[in-house]
Amino acid sequence: MQETGQKIMKLFDIPAYIIGDTCWGSCDLNTHAADMLGADLLFNIGHTISMETIDKKVIMINAYDDVNFDIVVEKYAKDRANQKYKILGIITDSQHLNQLQPSRKILENHGFKTVIGDGKGQLNDGQVFGCEFYPAYDIQKRVDAYIFLGQSMFHSVSIAMSTEKPTFMLDPYFNEFQQVNDKARVMEKKTILSIYKAQEATKIGIIIGLKEGQFSKIKALKFKKSLEVLGKDIQLIALTEITEERLRNFKGIDAYIQVACPRIAIDNHFTKPVLSVPQAEALIKVLKKEPMDDFLKLRHWL
């Protein structure tokens, strides 16, 4: 990226800035920074989605990891040749989309049947985000198990939690594979525990994310209204980065609901309960003395 930026400046005699802040996905493009810099175009490299552009000035550039999956897929296919899971859904994340078809061919050469789910919205066929799982969820009745191509425990565990199907993560860097359903059950128990802890809260902070693709003010206000009816005192908060350190600045709040990104609540450690949108919806059901049902078994957690 640094080299590309310098080449643009030399070839076209225009300023080219590298935005050095974190970027967690197409929900986190930092167009505010581009506007402040007076940039006419913003290139996002690597967060592959089904669209080439977002807004008028954002251009999405596909970039794939060049790691090869052949060894780990062969290893899985040979080790699991006699297993009961014969129809496999193949799923991956943005940087490994180019490995779907080669991996599919290997599995089918070993006698497995494979299914790659259709994309929806920003998702390509066979692609999942950390918060959206349409290509996995929509084929669950057609498959025995899922293969996730990549090293992301969060993505693979999310597939297992949203579908309750056997899910295997194939890691091409260490050429190892593992079933992640036990980890999914542990994570689900943690999410349920947070809900019951939040049930006891007197004052709940509802956090609105200020990143452009995570801004859900209407949903936050809807939760505010529902929880106030149920007797909770509500504090509305707006944050760009939701971290334990920043939440420590707020006093007298017993639990939080953040409507920005489900990964924040599920992935990170917080001293006080921090709920995602599905957890918040389950909390409202619990407060109404209703069963929370399968609150994570959804196509998306937004």
Predicted regions and their residues:
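Metallocofactor- and cofactor-centric catalytic cores in central/energy metabolism, strongly enriched
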Residues: 1-36, 41, 46, 243-246
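Peripheral docking tails and interdomain loops at the edges
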Residues: 173-177, 182, 262-302
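Short, charged N-terminal beta->alpha structural module
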Residues: 1-15, 91-118, 209-236
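Structural motif
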Residues: 40-41, 45-47, 63, 90-96, 144-145, 149-152, 255, ...
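Conserved, well-structured core segments that form the ligand-binding/active-site neighborhood
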Residues: 53-184, 196
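Redox- and metal-dependent alpha/beta enzyme cores, enriched for Fe-S-associated oxidoreductases
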Residues: 154-234, 241-250
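A C-terminal functional module that forms or caps the active site or interfaces directly
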Residues: 218-275, 280, 292-293
